[in-house]
Design a protein with these regions (language model features):
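Short acidic-aromatic linear motifs embedded in glycine-rich loops, typified by GG[WY][YF]DAGD(H)
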Residues: 22-148, 155-172, 176-180, 187-191, ...
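Sec-dependent bacterial lipoprotein signal peptides
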Residues: 1-19
Length: 437
């Protein structure tokens, strides 16, 4: 990804002696790569392919994590992509409205962004497929680049089809003026996805996997996985099963170590990673997702994306039995209370005894009601009671979710003397940020 398109000098304009005056000047710009000469050398072809992948990257991370039109870029993990999590957006966060509000207009900024994002990949892939033959590449490189371009086009059309169920189909380079095709059916788009993936699978020069070589690029295993998902959408389940089995034969496999160790730099090239976007600590190649997921003491986050309560409840007890809130000591009346009334169990200690927390107490009572608060709140032990609900559960729970009152290490610039905050617990209602413990 680091070898992205950059402005480079291509040399001076050359005058040619010719009987036809119209061709006397080479008008290729000297300060940038034009579409006319993009695919003319192996070096430029490599840059052109890298440029397609660059489309996935969010170049606006410094804008913050709020889902606004000016912040959208790349894979859009704070918008549509975040809805692929099992998440609770807060009620007025824009993406969640896509799930419950009326049909969106074609010019809706979130809908428009996804359309533009996918078709940028489609048209860039079409350009590569049509012009790679002009670059003077050796056969193995040419065939690999062709397969990568076919895969990326299939990936983009697959995403478009999931969102829109049929879109205009372009398989060759076109000008803006000629982008006038009408909607193709969802079945036609899935057929294109399958055809492009089959091209990759049948190409002898396309690697089975990219676990150790061509890291971050697609492979036959990735093509089998993508084609299998297309078959699933078409309800051709036997074909899908066959493709998913082929993924394993390509060298991919499930992670066999501890769950928490999977998400470490030394294991980022695990055989379970089929086609993954990866980041680097180097400035410009990192990610800011911890700010979106974290609270105020995690780089000033707003917990924009939160795990859904139902998703967390799916984590079973350590012995494999189903988790039941009413079986937690002190929470026997859980099922008799509304969601808002249950907020009393998540309150911090000291709301009755600390005058400094008077406004926080009022905030809690406003949500759960004074009767419920007086009956269930423990001034000393409220935190321990709810914390116990997350003990003795599937160990992956605390490896995935920051559970209530579980201490974590945080950092936010200019707080706590600009030092790490060790053993920080998010207490609710919030009183003060920027301290350890």
């Amino acid at each position: 990804m680091k070898n992205i398109l950059k402005n480079i000098a291509l040399g001076a304009i050359v005058l040619t002696a010719s009987a036809a005056c119209a061709d006397m000047l080479d008008t290729a710009p000297s300060n940038q790569i034009s579409s006319g000469n993009m695919w003319t050398t192996p070096e430029l072809a490599q840059k052109g392919m890298n440029g397609i992948y660059e489309t996935f990257y969010n170049r606006k991370q410094s804008n913050g994590t709020q889902v606004r039109s000016e912040n959208l870029d790349g894979l859009n993990k704070y918008g549509i992509e975040a809805l692929g999590f099992c998440t609770d957006y807060y009620a007025n966060n824009y993406p969640i409205q896509l799930l419950y509000s009326e049909a969106k207009r074609a010019n809706d900024w979130l809908v428009t962004f996804e359309w533009k994002f996918c078709y940028t990949i489609v048209h860039a892939s079409n350009d590569a497929i049509a012009n790679l033959g002009k670059a003077g590449l050796d056969t193995p490189t040419y065939e690999r680049f062709q397969s990568e371009a076919h895969f990326l086009r299939a990936w983009a059309y697959s995403r478009l089809n999931k969102f829109y169920q049929g879109v205009p189909l372009y398989l060759e380079p076109v000008t803006n003026e000629n982008c006038t095709k009408v909607q193709s059916s969802a079945e036609e788009i899935w057929k294109t996805v399958i055809d492009d993936c089959t091209y990759c699978i049948d190409n002898e020069y396309f690697p089975d996997n990219t676990i150790t070589n061509y890291i971050g690029r697609p492979s036959k295993g990735a093509a089998y996985a993508l084609r299998g998902m297309a078959y699933m959408w078409m309800k051709e389940y036997s074909a899908a099963e066959s493709d998913f089995e082929a993924v394993g034969r390509c060298g991919y496999d499930l992670w066999q170590g501890k769950y928490i160790d999977f998400f470490t730099p030394e294991n980022e090239h695990s055989p379970e990673m089929i086609f993954a976007i990866q980041y680097d600590e180097e400035s410009g190649y990192c990610d800011n997702i911890e700010q979106a997921l974290g609270a105020r003491d995690t780089y000033g986050g707003w917990t924009e994306v939160k795990p859904a309560a139902d998703f967390v409840d799916y984590y079973e007890n350590a012995d494999g039995t189903k988790f039941d809130w009413s079986k937690v000591p002190g929470l026997e009346d859980w099922n008799n209370l509304t969601a808002k009334q249950r907020a009393v169990f998540f309150c911090r200690d000291g709301l009755n005894s600390s005058k400094a927390l008077a406004s926080q107490k009022s905030q809690a009572i406003k949500i759960c009601g004074s009767d419920v608060f007086n009956r269930y709140y423990l001034d000393n032990g409220n935190e321990a009671r709810i914390k116990a609900a997350y003990d003795n559960r599937d160990p992956r729970l605390k490896q995935t979710i920051v559970t209530p009152y579980e201490p974590v290490d945080c950092y936010t610039p200019n707080y706590n003397g600009d030092e790490n905050m060790i053993g920080k617990a998010l207490r609710w209602p919030l009183y003060k940020q920027g301290t350890s413990g």
